[in-house]
Amino acid sequence: MPAIHGARAAEPVKIRFAWSTMPTHLVPAIFKTPVLKHHGKSYIAEPQNFSASTPMITAFAASQIDVGVFAPTALALAITNARVDIKVIADSLQDGRGGYRSQTLYVKANSGIKDVTDLKGKKIGVNGIGSASYTSIVAMLRKHKMDEKRDVSFVEVTFSNMLPMIEDDKIDATTIQMPMAEQLVKEGKYRGLFTSFDAMGPTVYNFLAARTAFLTANRAAVVDMLEDYIRALRWLSDPANKTEALRIIAAESKRTPESIGYLLTKDDYYRDPNMVPDIEGIQKTIDITNDLGFLAKRIEVASYADTSYVAEAAKRAAVAG
């Protein structure tokens, strides 16, 4: 009898997939590409939008989501504070690796803020306390002998409201997302003050995490999903598909294709082509967070990772071509 691959179930397994920003996270677009083999058969992905990784912790704890684009600090908080049984399963975004993009804190060009110390007394907009961007900003403040609680004020702002808030002078600095950030800098209206790379060197920005119970109960479906994800990422990254790829991503992120041409180039964050998570990189980021005093205790990331799912998926995707 021929070998049977993929998940076999009476109904496709529903995978509730959390993400927080488009087009950066790509998640809704991934599942609209024309190269998916298993979507709608062994599994169905249901993308769900969150403001940041940290609100996902509660959703994971309540079994309201199954997989999420997660930040290192959120992982540590989920494990140590919320006692969520969760695993790192795949790569998503790496910051500042090999000359690729690094998250940037922007200020108005005419704000008078010339260096980090000029942030004293200012309001900084972040998508969430404990998020990856928050961690890098605090690390930079500490490098300049500044206290994040005494010297500045952090304001939690959704990604979509960051630009309106700084335009209205309700905040003084924020991590404006691409592609708008690039356009505003070209127009001379804004400037980058510093990057996450400046603060911490190359780090893991986000990765895919999943509930352990869900992984155990649905291994075949998760591997199928990751195989599709790798195939979709490969297809989106292929210059031969650029026009259609940008059309799909633009439609899912409510942008124009022309405005997101930077995606999946060196002007974008680094994405591992086989989605292999950088466990050491995640550990480095968490250790920095721990040194900053954000965590009750240090965790060993390797103890909360299972790369067997993505390894099997990558092997299948390579064979499938």
Region spans (language model):
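Short, low-complexity disordered leader/linker segments with a strong preference
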Residues: 1-14, 318-321
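Ligand-binding "clamshell"
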Residues: 4, 10-11, 78-92, 183-197, ...
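Short, glycine-/small- and polar/acidic-enriched structural segments
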Residues: 9-147, 153-156, 172-178, 202
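Pocket-lining segment of extracytoplasmic ligand-binding domains
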Residues: 73, 149, 160-251
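Phosphate-coordinating loops and pocket residues in cytosolic domains that bind phosphorylated ligands
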Residues: 121, 186, 306
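Secondary-structure end/capping motifs
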Residues: 216-296
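Conserved C-terminal helix/tail region of periplasmic/extracytoplasmic solute-binding proteins
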Residues: 286-321
